[in-house]
Amino acid sequence: VNFYIINATSIAKNDVGNMKVKNTVLQSAFFALANILPIDEAIGYMKKAATKSYSKFGDDVVAQNHKAIELGANAFVKVDVPASWATAEDDKADVQLEGRADTVKVDVPADWKNAGETPAEAPAEGKRADLVDFVNKIVRPVSKMDGDSLPVSAFENMADGTYPQGAAAYEKRGVAVFVPVWHAENCIQCNQCAFVCPHATIRPFAMNAEEAAAAPAQTKFTAKMIGKGCEDLKFTMAISPLDCMGCTLCVKACPTKPEKRAIEMVAQETQLDQQEVFDYAVANVSEKKLPFADSTVKGSQFKQPLLEFSGSCAGCAETSYARLITQLFGERMYISNATGCSSIWGGSAPATPYTVNRESGRGPAWANSLFEDNAEHGLGIALGQKTLRERYIQKVRDLLVRYKEMNVTAEWTGCLEGYLDTLDDAEANAAAVEHMCSMLAEDVARGTCETVPAEREILEGKDYLAKKSIWIFGGDGWAYDIGFGGLDHVLASGEDVNVMVFDTEVYSNTGGQASKASNIGQVAQFAAAGKAIGKKSLSEIAMSYGYVYVAQIAMGADMAQTLKAIKEAEAYHGPSLIIGYAPCEMHGIKKGGMQNCQLEMKKAVEAGYWNMFRFNPAAEGAKLTIDSKAPTGDYQAFITNEARYSRLAQSFPERSKELFAKAEEAAKERYERLVKMAELYKD
């Protein structure tokens, strides 16, 4: 047996400068060792294949892969396997590396002594019995590619197609080579790192004295927690190294000075002890009443994210938006999700990332219908919930009439009136429901009053009493193209639904086909020579109704505007449409890729490629607010920093000049038109 090792991670990170080429390094080492072809010939074939595969992402990516091939062919080290390994008993073994005089200590896993035997896996544990049972009986066998062995009886409790939420928390995939480390002494407690995190793997916690005392010894705290009334609390930022995808967005978002950064990326193995801290905080730290409103970037991140550890790409913009929405409204949220990236990272069986609040047990109710009828599906959910709620509202009204006829105390009539007076105020109504139902439950338990049957009927419908937040999620392929007819119908209906469009300007999930959201000059499938016509103005179409709330957002350009638009849209009594700019792997962002996702949003706004605004029909005074300044950046420099545009210049230089100029002019006209519209909408 010949045993070789190679530090592909180090080569990719330090020598090539692109962590994604680890596989290319390993491939080259394999061909160098296998002798299937002469190594020079193999290198030639590999470079040719790399050029063909990666030219669409630009010359830099091709050059990086070529360098990885060259280095990988020579960077492996042979390890002489000691005969003593056959009967090894020690936890460490001395290993002689070929070409080196010294030896190194290598960990010998205990199960090597019984090679071939799979160690038993400890059963999943947790406070939610239904979820734990689901993970042990279904998630783990399926994850091990053993799903065919499951009997039909294993799905008996899921015959209606429902699955318990939150199974993704049990995966702990540990796929990131580098993860964040938090330096408490440098932290300014802004929570921007958590705000941009696509996978909810970095979270702020405010611990009281008891929680802090019980925390693992390796828990780090700032010297004090900033904020009025927080003097007795301790602030920590907990990180899950086994759930992190290593995207580095948190590091890029940190506003501290580079020489005193509060977060930096380090090797995963150095941070594994922080998993215990994260798990403790998630399971045991209560949500506090803090002086930071959830309408602020800082305050919103103390809310538990109800979308966590999804399978989306590292750096994904879509999950950053969706995670934030669940923090704000997740406990009373319904989601109808179009097929596409957001349905894949949002609902892939068996481990779904949407979860429930630890204290209330409530979370988003998620469903996926077809690609083309998602808007109609969401409207159906809204109308069904509306009908059920109105039925129980009437029962409360009838009971109130009966209470008044019986001359019951003001406390009893007050609890019903408190509910009826807050029907359109989601937060106040949720509190009123809890108060009313607790009183009704007490009366039902006594069982002596003639109103008990009516009270019992109301309690049976408790889940439908509070105001719900209905959301329709989907990408631009759905919203601009395949599902547009349904979306238009739903927006025109006037019903109180919220639509979130993740605009990647391409069919991301199916491999990069052009959509009506794709822009002039963009190269995609079905637009190999660059798209010649402009991007559909979905926002203007929706605004033309006059009664639809419409916003365009870009989280990396303005976190506060993103938060404000989402809050306003949900509070608006009527249909709302939010279009979020979402840089994607398909864009081929140069020099860093998706680790620059949030920065790319900022550049897009500065260059005038993307405009941020809010159109609120219910606003007093100006109804259209432009939140982005007049463009100051270089439009063509921005688009050519992305391979989806730069490869047009490589393939069709003259056509690219024509289309890029056309695209820049269209962007200027779009902003000028927006300014004129803002003037028209002033009272």
Per-range role (PLM):
Residues 1-8, 210-229, 354-356, 507-520, ...:
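Flexible glycine/proline-rich, aromatic-decorated loop/lid segments
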Residues 452, 458, 466-472, 481-496, ...:
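Glycine-rich ThDP/TPP pyrophosphate-binding loop and its adjacent helix/strand module
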Residues 61-63, 184, 314, 477-481, ...:
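Active-site glycine- and acidic-residue-rich loops that bind
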Residues 22-27, 344, 478-486, 509-510:
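Short glycine/serine/threonine-rich phosphate/pyrophosphate-binding segments
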Residues 9-12, 48-50, 208, 243, ...:
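Acidic, glycine-rich active-site loops and adjacent beta-strand->loop/helix elements
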Residues 4-6, 204, 265, 335-338, ...:
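General beta-strand structural signal in soluble alpha/beta enzymes
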Residues 55-244, 251-334, 338-469, 522, ...:
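Ferredoxin-type iron-sulfur electron-transfer modules and their immediate structural context
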Residues 2-53:
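Short alpha-helices
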